[in-house]
């Protein structure tokens, strides 16, 4: 009677897909080499036949080698290709033949005894669409053909409840020796039987395991996950090839073990008496050729085709967003910038002073780089002119007096991506030239700003006025923070990073926004007309400046010195002879790390500029920073109430006096020269 086998059916846990995705994105990238995967199966006597013979792939199958209690190990490999075209064009038969040859070679050289789980091995061909979260895969369970085929030749014996109980207990002692308890010989389960179960490994057959044992008492056994009454599990096909090739048997009793310890008194195992008689006229493969192989899994309709799992329907939308946000960034590391440190950018906490045109664009771009912590500071409300220029606001935000920009911007970021930690603070930044009207409220704003600066890594100055940038500049310099600054003109902009004091305490090499000034900032909005009060700029200037500011931060964070990175230097290109900026360090994944970028939209030009720190700067000079560190609020209070305090303290007043003296000397010389000329003309 012909023998039919119950094929394996694949069963993948959902966490495995997530693990495969992360492995592809973070590690394998474009490498589609096959890698090992752990498969598991178990005898499930209570399951219906069509639900049995399940090859399970757990969530940790790519990283773990531990086999859970009651399960049997299967050796698997997975080849996760890069495109669906690669999946379709893969030579499936060659792939199956390669897996079959591994089993055949292991049988021939005897290594199968060291890794018997190869007899139930499997191969997975897969493609993970990481954008749509769909996984196309096809399992193959390679089964070698026996030539000629094995047939059932006798009515097999059946075990009694006592025999099954004794076998199950003896197997438990072998598999779990730590659970074995000392027993009274008179009470042993084997003692009531006319024989005793002795269990050996497949290797022991060649050492004479069956010597002196009647043929009817010899069983070659395997753990059978099938529950079909007459059909053994798929891996028996490979075991029968081993029996023919290694044991040289043409008749054998097979014990398909299906019992379990909990119901050991109920016989479940299937016994088969099989025979394979050699026919001289039968055309078989050569003695050393790999036998024919079959094994690609069929779908539920019985067709040889791949399966597709859509993971999106099982995933939490927030989790989908998390993975999607990081996907494009991680793809940069596959080929273009493998040394890019994305975590350095992602973990940077950003404080944005200003939630207007610059602030809304900058925040969106920061999220594009994966930044998770963004905090806004602003005291204005959304007006009807804002939504067309400020992308986080819309018409409804303008109604009833307008929503507070800081609050609404933070909410809008969370609506775009729920995984971002965005908060808003409605407050006024104390400014030079603006007198204190409520000392308690101003001090409270100062203390909150001070705490926010301390709690963040990068400070963005995105306000409308020059004087509003002074205090955050002082605080950022004192705290050693990365300070990023952008300012707009009608068709021009400046984007820059402030110099950071080195760890050795020396002066910062690069200047800040105020280092080129010879006067301290003052009230710049007093007596201004409407066109001067509003930021009148071409609509494309703000997005361009914002993008360069965020890209500059990303470049700073990739530099080994981070905020203390020097400005790039000019040198002659050896090939072209032209002056070019040097990439420092040469392997920087994003290129240059400039100090300042000045853009001119009317000419569609940008210039890279660097400027040293100024020892008389009204914001970042050592005198100002040290006074702030020592006196804190009292220093700020005095700066806001005494008109010339900052000018005198920084040394700018002395610079101005010397400039006036020099100018007077020049004027005096000019007057004398004029007299001489006049006299000459008269003569």
Swiss-Prot record:
It holds the Pfam family ATG7_N. GO terms for biological process: autophagosome assembly; cellular response to nitrogen starvation; mitophagy; piecemeal microautophagy of the nucleus; protein modification by small protein conjugation; protein transport. Gene3D superfamilies: NAD(P)-binding Rossmann-like Domain, Ubiquitin-like modifier-activating enzyme ATG7 C-terminal domain, Ubiquitin-like modifier-activating enzyme ATG7 N-terminal domain. InterPro entries: Atg7, Atg7_N, Atg7_N_1, Atg7_N_2, ThiF/MoeB/HesA, ThiF_NAD_FAD-bd, Ubiquitin-activating_enz. Its main location: cytoplasm. Belongs to the ATG7 family. This is Ubiquitin-like modifier-activating enzyme atg7. It comes from Sclerotinia sclerotiorum (strain ATCC 18683 / 1980 / Ss-1) (White mold).
